[in-house]
Amino acid sequence: MESLFTGRIGLVIHLAALLSSAGEQHPDLAWRINADATWNLMRQAMSHAEAHGHTVRFVYPSSIAVHGRNASQSHPLLEDEAIAPRTLYGVTKRAMEQAGTWLSEECGRMLGQETGAAFDFRTIRYPGLLSAETLPTGGTSDYAPEMVHAAVRGEKASCFVPPHAQLPFMTMPEAAEATLALASAPRSCLQQNVYAVGGFAPTVAELENALRDRFPNFEVDYDPHPFRSEIVDSWPADVDDSAAQRDWGFQRGLDLGSALDDYLIPGIRNAHSQSKYECEETPRTL
């Protein structure tokens, strides 16, 4: 891991993780990737800051999975409300939020006193993410992108949560933009280390109806998985991102309709047509 820190590194964005459902199936691997590797990377970043006498900003993407029990309340949740993760993924995300904050506030301050260096830790807590280019695997919020991709491809969707289930979502480009905005914000503007961001928060039934408005023949086969449904029910139906708006100018962008019409549907169609073209153009070998 030391080889990652060559030259003078000022910003680390640590995206690697084993997601919620996959983490429940492979807990030891989830801990090694989500906790041990993250801790080691943070320590290396701090050592790099000390060695070069400058500040390293460490941006850590976290998740609504840190919330739990009674999180599905009628009001959008603040960052410190209903923290009781139901999954090991959520446990590791919360642990690293706290570990990074500790390093930033305690060890980082010690480095600064001695060398002028600092470890500047920032967390962006994502909702569910929707990508037009790839289908996610191993996440509990996967039902939404699976439904969208199936509708665009003219396929019947299978949904592992009931119609009333509800989670907040944002598109992948919006998540990337928000991450870079937090990364570039002056430290003096940040009043906390952990920031929630949100987008739109449809129920599964609302997502199904929006897709059927655009694809009249779209069908969904509901086959709720008890454990995955339980996880979704433990997460917030929406989040309060007023702190991100206040401190670094975050603004919610697309609603469900515009996310479908302006990004997801055309993007999935384009990716699907390219994939089909590549398959047709690939020469067959015997």
Task: Identify the function of each model-found stretch.
Residues 1-33:
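NAD(P)H-binding glycine-rich loop region in Rossmannoid oxidoreductase-like domains
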Residues 11, 25, 29-40, 83, ...:
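Glycine-rich NAD(P)-binding loop of the Rossmann-fold in SDR/ketoreductase-type enzymes
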Residues 12-14, 39-88:
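Conserved Rossmann-fold NAD(P)-dependent oxidoreductase catalytic core, especially the SDR/UDP-sugar
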Residues 23-24, 82, 125-138, 146-170:
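A conserved pocket-lining segment of Rossmann-fold NAD(P)-dependent short-chain dehydrogenase/reductase
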Residues 37, 41-45, 99-100, 178, ...:
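Hydrophobic positions on the long internal alpha-helix
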Residues 47, 71-72, 84-122, 152:
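Active-site Tyr-X1-5-Lys
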Residues 74, 81, 85-92, 136, ...:
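The catalytic Tyr-centered alpha-helix of NAD(P)H-dependent dehydrogenases
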Residues 155, 160-162, 168-286:
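C-terminal substrate-binding subdomain of Rossmann-fold SDR/epimerase-dehydratase oxidoreductases
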